[in-house]
């Protein structure tokens, strides 16, 4: 696994992955029409080794799974319905849910061979659950149905593991701040914080004018881990990981943890004990977020809509700016936020490839999906979404800001289950234990260091 990740990341970095997806508009041709090209031509390339034709007569059932909020659910379901109208012989069954617990359920399904035919996947799943190509099919084999020319080559390279294109990239994504300006204005502030000092000043104002229950920011364990990573990368200017080696010492991790603690101490954000006591599945499901007591979050640009869906109309929900914490670099990373893959257990991979192509590349599907999964990588899909007015301006603004700011590479081991799992992962253990005063900063730093090094080994 370690070698596969290192080789993949070397390819990604050389190609300049952080340049992002999209690009100039391209005329989309139906992927299925490309199958009409001669067999000789198709066998002379790395694309499909045989011509494929979508079955339009026999009854076929496909399954598809994804995670996300209500808006994403509605878009996927509408796109799948439109697909079945194009192919009346195909039925599409949908499975979806919130992120909490989703990866655990999907990893179990992959191991049991019961996963959906088409899966929305996190990028690191390709390495973690299919490091030898055992879980997902090689989409190069279906390039006469799924138009791979619509995707940037560097983004396809990022999804190539074990010499197999195991997913197509849906979007590039990074973390940024979103603010509820109604709460800021209630505190007498007319602008969101753009520097560390402005954030500290806002926290003081919130506490003085609104009370102890109001905070400019709320952050869970993973949010804190990513914020700390941005902070350390900005201060020291080093990538988080190089060649499967963590570039930060235990002492530097301790410094980062103490910085996170300073945000709690200065009323920037509540401690995790306070947040967990509410029993909310996510921050944005909780009353503290809905009522404006938590006035900011640090989340993926692709999550803009799901984060805002529970807010009242007068919340004045806006995307903020990235905050530069140090002088050595901007810090921070972007990644292939999610991909679409076909599982090895799928009995109808040609039709599954047609479903992915419909959702991402074809006019009707892409117009429905818009930016529900972030700013789409498909050139044709992005153009169709724009023509349909389905590009959410907030997501576009957030993604543009992220891509212009971040300057560090992303290592897929960062999201290994052993680190990221919400119940038993190292990040949750460290940040909850530290926030609950179960660990001091030195102990927490050592646990974090050891856990990361073990995941990288």
Tell me the role of every PLM-derived stretch.
Residues 85, 91, 187, 266, ...:
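Extracytoplasmic/periplasmic substrate-recognition and gating elements
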Residues 334, 397-452, 456:
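C-terminal capping/gating helix-and-loop segments adjacent to ligand/active sites or protein-protein/ligand interfaces
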Residues 135-138, 305, 338-421:
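Mature extracytoplasmic/periplasmic domains
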Residues 82-151, 182-194, 287-296, 310:
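Extracytoplasmic "Venus flytrap"/periplasmic binding protein-like
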